[in-house]
Each structure stands twice: as C-alpha cells, then as structure tokens.
C-alpha cells in the first residue's frame, strides 16, 4: 500500500519536517524552545486577530477600544491578557533558545543562526510597535523616545524620524502605520521561521555534546512529539497562571493612563524584555554612541561564529567557558534590573560597568578562555 504521508507533495514536506525527521537521540529539554516559539507565534497571531476585530487605530478611540475589549467583548479580557503576556512568554522562550544556541555552539550552523538573529530583530520590532497600540502614557512616550533615537543618525536622522512619524510628532499617522506594521510583521516572522527550519534541516540538529550524531538518530515521532507536547502544556500552564492570577505583573501602571503629550511620565521605560538593551543605551552619555551600543548588543550575536576559538563545539566539557557563560547571564539580569531603575547614583555606574562587562565577556574573555582550554587539553 502506498503511504499517502510519504507520497503526497504537501504531506511529504510535513512528514520530512515533523514525523520521519531523523533527530539526535540525546537532545535535552533545551531543544524544546523551537517548538514552543512556534506555539507562541500561532497563539499571538490568533489572539491578535481577534483583538484587531475590535481595536481602532485612531488616537481619539484607541485607548477606549482596548477598554471596550476588556469590558464589553465576550472573553475580551482573557484574549487581551493572553496576547500581552503571550509576548512575555515569547521572549522568555526566545532568550532561552538563543542562550541554548550560545552554550551548545549551535551558531556554527551559519545560515540557521543568521536567520535566527534576523528573526530576533523582527520579533523585537513587532513587540515595540505593538506596545504603542493601547495608546497609554508609556505607549506614547516609549514610541516618542525610541523613534527619536533615529535622529542620532548623521545628516538624514531628523528627516528619517519625521518620515516614520508621518508628521512632526507621534500622532494619528504614527499609530495607524504602527498598527499596520504590527499586523503584517508576524506573518513575515512565520515565513522567516520556515526558512530557519529549512536551513536547520539541511544540516540536522546539534546535540548537547556538540559531536556529530549521524550514527545515532531516532525518528522525531513519537519520541520528540511527546516531549514537545509536555513542553507546550507547561508553557500554557505558566501563561494561564500569569493571565488569570497576575495579568498586570509584567506591565506598566502608567499604561492605564490615556496618552497625554503634555505630561511626561516620571520614568520612561520599555517592557521588561527590552530593559537590558535599554540599560546599555542609557549607560552611554552620547546619543549616537548609545544607539550604536544598543544595536551592537544584539548584532554581536552575528559575530559568535567568528569568535569561536575552541576546538570543541559545545560548552558541555569546558568548565571555564561554562562559568563565563553564567556570568554573562547574571550580567544580563543585572542590566535588566538597571533598565527599570531611575537614572541616578548608584544605578548609573552599575549600568555602565554591566554594559562594559557584557561586551568584554563576549568579545575578549570568551575567545581567550576557549584558547586556554585548548592549551590545557594540549590541542
């Protein structure tokens, strides 16, 4: 009997990607985050679609329309909070996914890694324009401050900012175009994710040891299907705990005040998942320097394959590099904390030291440590 799963042109693609895919037999739960990101994206697109049915992208009615969704639309409150907190879960999974890639040397798959970095930028852009839509105080001032950073670009900066704004300040035109961007970008993310997966399946997955696993492969279904389902159930559990018990835990109280261009909030800050980059931006007193540091803090990921000096791929058998990796994680958590603090002593100096340490670990200490480990093993 001909198996339709293996012969049908469309089903064959799905089969080779999710069913008969040969996978390493020893990949740990750190490899779950790819599928979790896929679930997050689907969840965000679905909840976002239902929100877009009731939302109006006009400065006069945007805030009221979000209130209307929460008060009057059937289960509108749960859809709204699933979307807002779903973004937080998305970024938690993203950071774990990137961290796994750094720890286990997955960045040696160049195409997959570079598409992944582009995906990270796209998701960050989507989250930023989405945060502007409720048109609260932090939405408005966040949009004003972050878009204003582009004015640091020499010669064309000011024109560029006014072009993005569609006027001389953040106003109706800005809100409308941000809604359009926020609607289209998730579909671009979905397309990029397919390309990401395409490149990954050209090489096959990495594994915790970093050693080629061609000699020991198992089919994706049922082993990793079950493992992924467990991860998905845990993700939904954490998301629903957040949505049903503490929906505003990760939000900003200022965003419950309608946008007012005449009243600046005492402390402008983005959502928690951007705070580490925001802290790096603020730690440099010069505007252009801050913007360059901000972009570099993410763009530095593209350099990871070039900075890999170890003879081993993974950090699994490299204790010194492991210590350095966890210091980097602690440094990023420190930056996240600093990003949410006011600009005053001692937070300024802590932020500057943490920012210097971030770049120093990645650009200097990691390559040196890897070389030392090579020499200790007489390689």
Swiss-Prot record:
User: What is annotated about its quaternary structure and interactions?
Assistant: The cytochrome bc1 complex contains 11 subunits: 3 respiratory subunits (MT-CYB, CYC1 and UQCRFS1), 2 core proteins (UQCRC1 and UQCRC2) and 6 low-molecular weight proteins (UQCRH/QCR6, UQCRB/QCR7, UQCRQ/QCR8, UQCR10/QCR9, UQCR11/QCR10 and a cleavage product of UQCRFS1). This cytochrome bc1 complex then forms a dimer.
Q: List the disulfide bonds.
A: none
Which SUPFAM superfamilies does the entry link to? a domain/subunit of cytochrome bc1 complex (Ubiquinol-cytochrome c reductase), Transmembrane di-heme cytochromes
Location in the cell reads:
Mitochondrion inner membrane
Coiled-coil region: none
Q: Which UniProt keywords apply?
A: Electron transport, Heme, Iron, Membrane, Metal-binding, Mitochondrion, Mitochondrion inner membrane, Respiratory chain, Transmembrane, Transmembrane helix, Transport, Ubiquinone
What does the record say about how the cofactor binds? Binds 2 heme b groups non-covalently.
Q: What does this protein do?
A: Component of the ubiquinol-cytochrome c reductase complex (complex III or cytochrome b-c1 complex) that is part of the mitochondrial respiratory chain. The b-c1 complex mediates electron transfer from ubiquinol to cytochrome c. Contributes to the generation of a proton gradient across the mitochondrial membrane that is then used for ATP synthesis.
State a single Gene Ontology molecular function: ubiquinol-cytochrome-c reductase activity
GO process terms (BP) = mitochondrial electron transport, ubiquinol to cytochrome c
Q: Which regions span the lipid bilayer?
A: 33-53, 77-98, 113-133, 178-198, 226-246, 288-308, 320-340, 347-367
Protein name as annotated: Cytochrome b
For binding heme b b566, which residues are annotated in this chain's numbering?
A: 97, 196
Q: Which family does it belong to?
A: Belongs to the cytochrome b family.
Q: Chief localization class?
A: mitochondrion
Q: Which GO terms describe its cellular component?
A: mitochondrial inner membrane; respiratory chain complex III
Q: Anything else the record notes?
A: Heme 1 (or BL or b562) is low-potential and absorbs at about 562 nm, and heme 2 (or BH or b566) is high-potential and absorbs at about 566 nm.
Entries under PROSITE patterns matching the protein? CYTB_CTER, CYTB_NTER
Specify which residues bind a ubiquinone according to the UniProt entry for this protein: 201
Give the taxonomic lineage as stored in the record.
Eukaryota, Metazoa, Chordata, Craniata, Vertebrata
List required co-factors.
Answer: heme b
């Amino acid at each position: 009997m001909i198996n339709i799963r293996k012969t049908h042109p469309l089903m064959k693609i799905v089969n080779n990607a999710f069913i008969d895919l040969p996978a390493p037999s020893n990949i740990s739960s750190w490899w779950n985050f790819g599928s979790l990101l896929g679930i997050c994206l689907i969840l965000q697109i679905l909840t976002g679609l239902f929100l877009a049915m009731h939302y109006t992208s006009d400065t006069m009615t945007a805030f009221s329309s979000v209130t209307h969704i929460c008060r009057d639309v059937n289960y509108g409150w749960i859809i709204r909070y699933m979307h807002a907190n779903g973004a937080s879960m998305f970024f938690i999974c993203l950071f774990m996914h990137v961290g796994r890639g750094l720890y286990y040397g997955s960045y040696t798959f160049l195409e997959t890694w570079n598409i992944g970095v582009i995906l990270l930028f796209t998701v960050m852009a989507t989250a930023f324009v989405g945060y502007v839509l409720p048109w609260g105080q932090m939405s408005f001032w966040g949009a004003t401050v972050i878009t204003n950073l582009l004015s640091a670009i020499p010669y064309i900066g000011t024109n560029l900012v006014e072009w993005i704004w569609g006027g001389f300040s953040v106003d109706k035109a800005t809100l409308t175009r941000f809604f359009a961007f926020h609607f289209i970008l998730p579909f671009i993310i979905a397309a990029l994710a397919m390309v990401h997966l395409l490149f990954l399946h050209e090489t096959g997955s990495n594994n915790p040891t970093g050693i080629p696993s061609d000699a020991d492969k198992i089919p994706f279904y049922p082993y990793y299907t079950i493992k992924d389902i467990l991860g998905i159930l845990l993700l939904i559990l954490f998301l629903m705990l957040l949505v049903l018990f503490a929906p505003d835990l990760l939000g900003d109280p200022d965003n419950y005040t309608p946008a007012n261009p005449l009243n600046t909030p005492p402390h402008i800050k983005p959502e928690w998942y951007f705070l580490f980059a925001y802290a790096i931006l603020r730690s440099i007193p010069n505007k252009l320097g801050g913007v360059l540091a901000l972009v570099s803090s993410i763009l530095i990921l593209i350099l990871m394959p070039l900075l890999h000096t170890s003879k081993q791929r993974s950090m699994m058998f490299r204790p010194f590099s492991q210590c350095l990796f966890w210091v980097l994680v602690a440094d990023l958590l420190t930056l996240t904390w600093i990003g949410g603090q006011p600009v005053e002593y001692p937070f300024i100096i802590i932020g500057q030291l943490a920012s210097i340490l971030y770049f120093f670990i990645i650009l200097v200490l990691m390559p040196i440590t890897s070389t030392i480990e090579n020499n200790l093993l007489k390689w």
